Amino acid sequence: MTEKKYIVALDQGTTSSRAVVMDHDANIISVSQREFEQIYPKPGWVEHDPMEIWATQSSTLVEVLAKADISSDQIAAIGITNQRETTIVWEKETGKPIYNAIVWQCRRTAEICEHLKRDGMEEYIRNNTGLVIDPYFSGTKVKWILDHVEGSRERARRGELLFGTVDTWLIWKMTQGRVHVTDYTNASRTMLFNIHTLDWDDKMLEVLDIPREMLPEVRRSSEVYGQTNIGGKGGTRIPISGIAGDQQAALFGQLCVKEGMAKNTYGTGCFMLMNTGEKAVKSENGLLTTIACGPTGEVNYALEGAVFMAGASIQWLRDEMKLINDAYDSEYFATKVQNTNGVYVVPAFTGLGAPYWDPYARGAIFGLTRGVNANHIIRATLESIAYQTRDVLEAMQADSGIRLHALRVDGGAVANNFLMQFQSDILGTRVERPEVREVTALGAAYLAGLAVGFWQNLDELQEKAVIEREFRPGIETTERNYRYAGWKKAVKRAMAWEEHDE
């Protein structure tokens, strides 16, 4: 009898490294997770230790196999998904980083971004990389490291230093320095990559003074990049055959591989991506144009919108307002009242993301009357997550001309049935919640498995995609639009709050 085979997905996130073992039916067999240190050298600066990222990720890989009681020769392939934009520069010879990883959340390169804007680069960057000028993306982080570590730019020109996002760093370590690659999805988040020519952009490299010699080779999201030995000693060599940035991996894990399919991930914030097929749609409504995975890991394009406060607003109800003891309580209290009694909560604690991009907006509660109680405020806070998702979807539909028929959802907050029903109500479209909630890891596993023939094609994967529950709109169009108009009025009044009058 042949031994049963499995796929391992490595999910390297912002606060923890995880490894997930899946079988041929896409069932999760075991999970291992390790958190690592968040480093805050100055206000607004965020770093990770790349060696700690590697140590936690490699140990979860060994651990997860031990937990599942399977041997390395039962692993058909490994897929990697990762926090995007986080930037690492290391020595080619020794494999030692020359500086800590600069994390996607880090704002230290705001001044470099202001220079780019003053130099009139906004339109070029939008047209060629699909992005907006923001410290979020990798390009300015690489420049900062080369500007601040003495002699590093010259060393990079001589080919002594390498740059990579987290996927590139992990593969370099897993292959003992034999393979220096990234995939199209991660490259598209660097602000150094031309999403139309599918190559590093010479003008961006010149403007940021980044030597091409230090950049990884860019490959498809589903192919064999190299092989690794788990534990580092002899034994079976396992192919590494899937890579995707976390949000694109979730899009693929939800099997949103056709034009017009979309998913929303409800975490601390919300990330909504819509596959636009082979067409890169330039956004006129505050969204990003990015690369996604097509049916066999080839290049598709997507529109992406990020909402800053989703689960974080529920944490605020719990930690600061003390209105609930646990995030799970929010559903119970929200359903104790029939409606919000006219209340709208705009959770713009750190400004507003897509499609408004207003850093001066601040959180506000509107419509308070003597009859408003805590349950109304809890309900209005939950509803704000759904309203913000509609804001992003309206922008997507305006940009793409595509009408959404169903939204696939994942992330912690999708367990909240009240929120999912209200999301369907306010969008006027079906909301589909999958049985397997680990869709980011699932996406990495699918990409890796397809590359080595573990799964033959997407049709085979579609059979495994079980929708656990479907939510359908339960309110009339007039009611939907009336409520949404109230939200838009509230947002307008919360905007520009911190802007100082002359």
From Swiss-Prot:
- Which residues pair up as cystines? none
Would the keyword Metal-binding turn up in this protein's UniProt record?
Answer: yes
**InterPro entries xrefs:** ATPase_NBD, Carb_kinase_FGGY, Carb_kinase_FGGY_CS, FGGY_C, FGGY_N, Glycerol_kin
Q: Which GO terms describe its cellular component?
A: cytosol
MF terms from GO for this chain are: ATP binding; glycerol kinase activity; metal ion binding
Origin organism is Escherichia coli O127:H6 (strain E2348/69 / EPEC)
Q: What is the recorded name of this protein?
A: Glycerol kinase
Give the regulation of activity. Answer: Activity of this regulatory enzyme is affected by several metabolites. Allosterically and non-competitively inhibited by fructose 1,6-bisphosphate (FBP) and unphosphorylated phosphocarrier protein EIIA-Glc (III-Glc), an integral component of the bacterial phosphotransferase (PTS) system.
Which superkingdom heads the taxonomic lineage of this protein's source? Bacteria
Enzyme nomenclature, EC number:
2.7.1.30
Enzyme class, broadest EC rank: transferase
Concerning PROSITE patterns, the annotation shows: FGGY_KINASES_1, FGGY_KINASES_2
Q: What PANTHER family does the database record attribute to this sequence?
A: GLYCEROL KINASE, SUGAR KINASE
* UniProt keyword annotation of RNA-binding present: no
Q: Where does sn-glycerol 3-phosphate bind?
A: T14, R84, E85, Y136, D246
Quaternary structure, from the entry = Homotetramer and homodimer (in equilibrium). Heterodimer with EIIA-Glc. Binds 1 zinc ion per glycerol kinase EIIA-Glc dimer. The zinc ion is important for dimerization.
Family of this protein: Belongs to the FGGY kinase family.
